[in-house]
From Swiss-Prot:
<feature type="domain" description="BRCT">
    <location>
        <begin position="584"/>
        <end position="666"/>
    </location>
</feature>
<dbReference type="InterPro" id="IPR013839">
    <property type="entry name" value="DNAligase_adenylation"/>
</dbReference>
<dbReference type="Pfam" id="PF12826">
    <property type="entry name" value="HHH_2"/>
</dbReference>
<dbReference type="GO" id="GO:0006260">
    <property type="term" value="P:DNA replication"/>
</dbReference>
<dbReference type="GO" id="GO:0046872">
    <property type="term" value="F:metal ion binding"/>
</dbReference>
<feature type="binding site">
    <location>
        <position position="314"/>
    </location>
    <ligand>
        <name>NAD(+)</name>
    </ligand>
</feature>
<keyword id="KW-0235">DNA replication</keyword>
<feature type="binding site">
    <location>
        <begin position="83"/>
        <end position="84"/>
    </location>
    <ligand>
        <name>NAD(+)</name>
    </ligand>
</feature>
<protein>
    <recommendedName>
        <fullName>DNA ligase</fullName>
        <ecNumber>6.5.1.2</ecNumber>
    </recommendedName>
</protein>
<keyword id="KW-0460">Magnesium</keyword>
<feature type="binding site">
    <location>
        <position position="429"/>
    </location>
    <ligand>
        <name>Zn(2+)</name>
    </ligand>
</feature>
<keyword id="KW-0862">Zinc</keyword>
<comment type="function">
    <text>DNA ligase that catalyzes the formation of phosphodiester linkages between 5'-phosphoryl and 3'-hydroxyl groups in double-stranded DNA using NAD as a coenzyme and as the energy source for the reaction. It is essential for DNA replication and repair of damaged DNA.</text>
</comment>
<feature type="binding site">
    <location>
        <position position="424"/>
    </location>
    <ligand>
        <name>Zn(2+)</name>
    </ligand>
</feature>
<keyword id="KW-0520">NAD</keyword>
<keyword id="KW-0436">Ligase</keyword>
<dbReference type="InterPro" id="IPR012340">
    <property type="entry name" value="NA-bd_OB-fold"/>
</dbReference>
């Protein structure tokens, strides 16, 4: 084949593959078999290897995933990706309509109704029709660059179809997993001994936030647009027209979307799908109602965190009944023994549920729940399955009381009561160690990708790891002794463990699992004391001087820090090279200290603190003369009074957002 013939064949293969991708993933109407498709794809791969000069960014082969990234770059949203205000009743929807009509001085307003997909909000930037960047929503102002991962999603066109294409358009929508694919993924993970995803949203978010996009490529993800950000050279006029244009460009559109000539028609849409949501193939937790006329959007405007032209109605939590077959006892990293109900599998809000926590033995007594009972189940916040009651009228007399274990169900050691909680007091209990290791490897702590529950189980059971520090002493050869871990996976896990040594001090502190030290408290302690040595020498007065740390918490922290085992572990981690001092990040806010008070509307105070820290600034927990800016939200506390007395610079949320956006953009 000549070079010119190869070029023509490559172009034709791309056209064919993208056409069949569109038929399969967008229209759900394939014209060829999987085998025929694979044959075309393999031919394209072969030709592009022979003639790499003809590879283009929009080639179907570029979906398979880029080399693993060390971390995600940040992306500033030129048009903020705002969240939506929620409504839980029809009256709240009617009140929204009243506000809209009053602001527009209109008797009737046309709306557009869409399902609120339950996945991960992402943004796709196209320049002259070519997909050039994809990012997560993040805090609405700054997200993460996940372009390589989003390229693997077949319902995201790498190049827009048709001729009506603006120079720049930013498409926003939801990346999600179909319910059938979520079930299949969890079945596969269960067979491999991997931890299961709690729901399709977590599965989608976890897949897109993979540093290795080849993993994302293995997951069956979909994308549907719902809005736009930056647009140049085009006016869509209505939400309905915008989505129609997206369809013409090659995106998959929800066929159930409907235009409503009045709020009553919108309510009919809500009522129908509240009753029929189980028929949907994708996860949806509500309905979004938007003013259809885009000209009205500018008139209605936005608040700091949500548009005034749209509202999200949240479906009420679904309840189901099922049989409680048995109760098992789990031991957590702090030794608390939790009763867990094993259930006859039941589909609840689109996910199969076969177990639910009973929290503690006080709850067991209050519910009077017994083995063999028919129990009432719902998903708290659409995430955690929770038993809310018992169908006592369905009892047969064969039900059995649930008795607390007299010894630890894992190590057989002694137990003791701590209020409503039963605890194993054996500090060498393998279950506690496994819990500590899981916590250490978690995203908010050391974020060790690949160190999941099944690997930790094997590391502990095989005696390879007896404390957290032992993780950093493992070799690739040690990891190769684990079941089902091949050379490539073992090498990658080893590298991920070693790479975690670079995590900042506050995450090490959080990862230690000190009782009552959550992520926020760990950040405050790291900021206040600056090093592990200073913290180990802290006094009660020093701890309680930090806002949010009371006497009980301070006593618990001091007691934990005085433990010989904690001292020994910290010494080992120091020797192994983990960070035990707070580092200052280079950035435009370096040298500036911020304090937040009151409720922020655009993001949580935690997200605001992360934003400041990512730009090199510091966040203090209390007001002092060393503070440069006090950011005031709604209902500020005593910090505002103190700041005024000290004559500090006080700014509102809007000024803060302008400041960080300006600094982030340089």
């Amino acid at each position: 084949m000549t070079r010119e013939e190869a070029k023509k064949r490559i172009e034709r293969l791309r056209e064919l593959i993208e056409y069949h991708n569109y038929r399969y993933y967008v229209l759900d109407s394939p014209e060829i078999s999987d085998e025929e498709y694979d044959k075309l794809y393999r031919e394209l791969v072969t030709l592009e290897k022979q003639f790499p000069e003809f590879i283009t960014p929009d080639s179907p082969t570029q979906r398979v995933g880029a080399p693993p990234a060390k971390e995600f770059a940040t992306v500033t949203h030129e048009v903020p990706m705002l969240s939506l205000d929620n409504a839980f009743t029809e009256d709240e929807i009617k009140a929204f309509d009243q506000r809209v009509r009053s602001a527009l001085n209109q008797q009737h307003v046309e709306y557009f109704c869409e399902h609120k997909l339950d996945g991960l909000a992402v943004s796709l930037l196209y320049e002259n029709g070519l997909f050039v960047r994809g990012s997560t929503r993040g805090n609405g102002y700054v997200g993460e660059d996940v372009t390589a991962n989003l390229k693997t999603i077949k319902t995201i066109p790498l190049r827009l179809k048709g001729e009506n294409i603006p120079p720049v358009v930013e498409i926003r929508g939801e990346a999600f997993m179909m319910l059938r694919d979520f079930e299949a993924l969890n079945e596969q993970r269960q067979a491999l001994g991997q931890p299961l995803f709690a729901n399709p949203r977590n599965a989608a978010a976890g897949s897109i936030r993979q540093l290795d996009s080849s993993i994302t490529a293995q997951r069956k993800l979909y994308f549907m647009p719902y809005g736009f950000g930056l647009v140049q050279g085009m006016d869509f006029e209505t939400q309905e027209r915008f989505l129609k244009q997206c369809q013409e460009w090659g995106f998959r559109i929800n066929e159930h979307n409907r235009k409503a000539s009045s709020i009553e028609e919108a309510l009919e849409f809500i009522r129908y799908w509240t009753e029929h949501r189980v028929e949907l193939p994708f996860p949806a937790d509500g309905v979004v109602i938007k003013v259809n006329n885009l000209r009205y959007w500018d008139i209605l405007g936005t608040t700091a965190h949500a548009p005034r032209y749209a509202i999200a109605y949240k479906f009420p939590a679904e309840e189901k009944e099922t049989k409680l077959k048995d109760v098992v006892f789990q031991v957590g990293r702090t030794g608390i023994i939790t009763p867990v109900a094993m259930l006859e599998p039941v589909v609840l809000d689109g996910a199969t549920v076969s177990r639910a926590t009973l929290h503690n033995f006080d709850i067991v007594r209050q519910l009077d729940v017994r083995k063999g009972d028919v129990v009432k189940l719902k998903r708290a916040g659409m995430v955690i399955p929770e038993i809310i009651g018992v169908a006592a009228e369905k009892r047969t007399g064969k039900e059995e009381q649930i008795e607390p274990p007299t010894t630890c169900p894992v190590c057989g050691g002694p137990t003791e009561w701590d209020g409503a909680y039963l605890k194993c007091v054996n500090i060498t209990c393998p279950a506690q160690l496994k819990g500590h290791l899981l916590h250490w490897a978690s995203r908010d702590a050391m974020d060790i990708d690949g160190l999941g529950e099944s690997i930790i189980e094997n590391l502990v059971d095989m005696g390879l790891v007896k404390n957290i520090a032992d993780l950093y002493k493992l070799s690739v050869q040690d990891l190769l002794t684990l079941p089902r871990l091949a050379q490539r996976s073992a090498t990658k896990l080893y590298e991920n463990i070693q790479r975690s040594k670079d995590r900042p001090f506050f995450r090490v502190l959080y990862g230690l699992g000190i009782p009552r030290v959550g992520l926020k408290t760990a950040q405050m302690l790291a900021e206040h004391f600056g090093s592990i040595n200073a913290l180990l020498n802290a006094t009660m007065d020093e701890l309680t001087s930090i806002e949010g740390i009371g006497t009980d918490t301070a006593e618990t922290i001091l007691k934990a820090l005085q433990s010989p085992q904690v001292h020994e572990l910290i010494d080992q981690l120091k020797t192994l090279g983990l960070k035990m001092e707070q580092e200052s990040i280079e950035g435009p806010l370096k040298g500036l200290t911020f304090v937040f008070t009151g409720t922020l509307t655009s993001m949580s105070r935690g997200d605001a603190a992360k934003l400041v820290q990512s730009l090199g600034g510091k966040v203090a927990s209390s007001v002092s003369k060393n503070v440069d800016y006090v950011v005031v939200g709604e209902d500020p506390g005593s910090k505002l009074d103190k700041a005024q007395k000290l004559g500090l610079t006080i700014i509102d949320e809007e000024a803060f957002l302008k400041m960080v956006k300006r600094e982030h953009n340089g």
